[in-house]
Amino acid sequence: MKIRSSVKKICNKCYLIRRKNNLLVVCINNKHKQRQG
């Protein structure tokens, strides 16, 4: 999980989720996991 100020989709399989006012990027590839912080 990378914590970034701006989260972007890295590949086509990535998708954005809003969970408890946090933006998350979730993907099949675990290296693409990101959270806005």
Swiss-Prot record:
Pfam families: Ribosomal_L36
GO cellular component: chloroplast; ribonucleoprotein complex; ribosome
UniProt KW keywords: Chloroplast, Plastid, Ribonucleoprotein, Ribosomal protein
Protein's GO biological process: translation
PROSITE patterns, alphabetized: RIBOSOMAL_L36 (PS00828)
Coiled-coil residues: none
GO molecular function: structural constituent of ribosome
Broad class of the protein's primary localization: plastid
InterPro entries referenced in this protein's UniProt entry, alphabetically: Ribosomal_bL36, Ribosomal_bL36_sp
Subcellular location: Plastid, Chloroplast
Family matches, as NCBIfam families: rpmJ_bact
Family, similarity comment: Belongs to the bacterial ribosomal protein bL36 family.
Protein name (Swiss-Prot/TrEMBL): Large ribosomal subunit protein bL36c
